[in-house]
Amino acid sequence: MFKKLLLCTLLAASGIAMAAPANPHQPSYGTWQSRDKSKSITLSSKGLNIVVNAPASCKRRNQWGQVISWVSGKQLRSDINESLELNDQLADDKGSYRAEMAAVLPKIRDNARYFKILGYLSCSDGASGLIQIDANTALLIEIAPDEFYTVVRKRKP
């Protein structure tokens, strides 16, 4: 009897876990777009559109995924400053990236935690994702292998 009860409990728990959304953070749902509309990313309960809508050839077993985490404001500031230094070394147009990041840095509080979702595929070189700053502002993150950010805003439906 105990074994049957344990089995039923485990099956029920696994069913609940399998029904859980890949992205449980509802405030992040929607399409996020850069000011010039050159970059965008869409999130839903299934996760990032770049992963959800990828062709099957890009989703080979154990070679794709989504990682959801929370990053501290202090760590995010540090990561942005590191990307600014790298951009200064690599880019011809240093001013526009620096200005874009300068506009978002005041919104980041050191003691706050920010929602972060990254997706990667076997057919791409790196990862993409989103870090939500507030209800309407986020950073599109592109890693290949260095991290660079684009300020994106939530598009109205």
Regions found by a protein language model. Give the residues of each.
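Contiguous, well-ordered beta-strand patches that form the walls/edges
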Residues: 38-40, 55-133
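Short, hydrophobic/aromatic-rich segments at coil-to-beta transitions
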Residues: 26-31, 49, 110-119, 136-139
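Hydrophobic h-region of N-terminal signal peptides that target proteins for export
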Residues: 10-19
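Short, well-ordered strand-loop elements centered on a beta-strand within folded domains, enriched
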Residues: 47-55, 83-84, 137-143
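Short, exposed beta-strand-loop hairpins at the edges of beta-sheets
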Residues: 129-132, 136-149
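Short, solvent-exposed loop/hinge segments that bridge or flank secondary-structure elements
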Residues: 22-63, 122
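Short, solvent-exposed mixed-charge patches
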Residues: 155-157
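Bacterial N-terminal signal peptides that target proteins for export
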Residues: 1-6
